[in-house]
UniProtKB/Swiss-Prot annotation:
Domain of life according to the entry: Bacteria
Gene name per UniProt: queC
Protein name, per record: 7-cyano-7-deazaguanine synthase
One GO term (biological process): queuosine biosynthetic process
Function noted in UniProt: Catalyzes the ATP-dependent conversion of 7-carboxy-7-deazaguanine (CDG) to 7-cyano-7-deazaguanine (preQ(0)).
The protein's Enzyme Commission number: 6.3.4.20
Catalytic activity: 7-carboxy-7-deazaguanine + NH4(+) + ATP = 7-cyano-7-deazaguanine + ADP + phosphate + H2O + H(+)
Pfam families the record matches: QueC
CC cofactor note: Binds 1 zinc ion per subunit.
């Protein structure tokens, strides 16, 4: 695999998907920068996970303040008075959905990237396992890519390595990169803020575990 000599920025939460994307990016770009967001999330330990992973692998890391999002979009990830849905509702999106989150994350990262002369931005969204979140869809990413290019008169390229793969294949990607244990033990995907295997009860933990078991069944025989 040839290495792109350009720089790239990863939208990095410290969770399974974005950490997998971080290593995907390290395989493809000469220099990688990680950007995380503090939006008053209850599972703020994910930011500590992000710091630790970046420190361990000598990756430049920035945390941007997006606390205003908590005031604008009530949801179970930022409000202590709202419990996380254990199961996705039949109609509508789960209460863990944060309106505008991915749009704002990618927009702020794009502003950050342009100031540094960087075009490539990587995000871990997936339409295969998107839990009903509209801002994880491929059509949204493609639309935003065009909008950002027009808004800033700049040629951004939004990469979505996980867009069309499920959690089992995401685990397989980590295995192929030699970072399976890091993803399994050092990331935080749980909506209740528990590192590694998580609480086992929230939708994120259930999806992660289901994917891991499928990965073991398909690829670890």
């Amino acid at each position: 695999m040839s290495i792109n000599n350009e720089k790239a920025i990863v939208v990095f939460s410290g969770g399974q998907d974005s950490t997998t994307c971080l290593f995907w990016t390290k395989k493809r770009f000469k220099e990688v920068i990680a950007v995380s967001f503090d939006y008053n999330q209850k599972h703020k330990l994910e930011l500590e996970c992000a710091k630790e992973i970046c420190s361990k692998y000598n990756i430049e890391h920035h945390i941007l303040d997006l606390g205003l999002l908590n005031q604008l979009a009530p949801n179970s990830l930022t409000r202590t008075d709202i419990k996380v849905d254990k199961n996705a509702p039949e109609d509508g999106v789960p209460n863990s959905f944060v309106d505008g989150r991915n749009m704002l994350f990618l927009t702020f990262v794009a502003v950050f990237a342009k100031q540094r002369g960087i075009s490539h931005i990587i995000t871990g969204v997936s339409q295969s396992d998107f839990s009903g979140y509209p801002d994880c869809r491929d059509v949204f990413i493609k639309s935003l890519n065009v909008t950002l290019n027009l808004a800033m008169d700049y040629e951004f390229v939004l990469h979505t390595p996980l867009m069309w793969i499920d959690k089992a294949e995401t685990w397989k990607m980590a295995y192929d990169f030699g970072v399976l244990d890091i993803i399994k033990n050092e990331t935080l995907t749980c909506y209740n803020g528990i590192k590694g295997n998580g609480c086992g009860e929230c939708p994120s933990c259930k999806l992660r575990k289901k994917g891991y078991l499928k990965f073991k069944e398909l690829y670890m025989k």
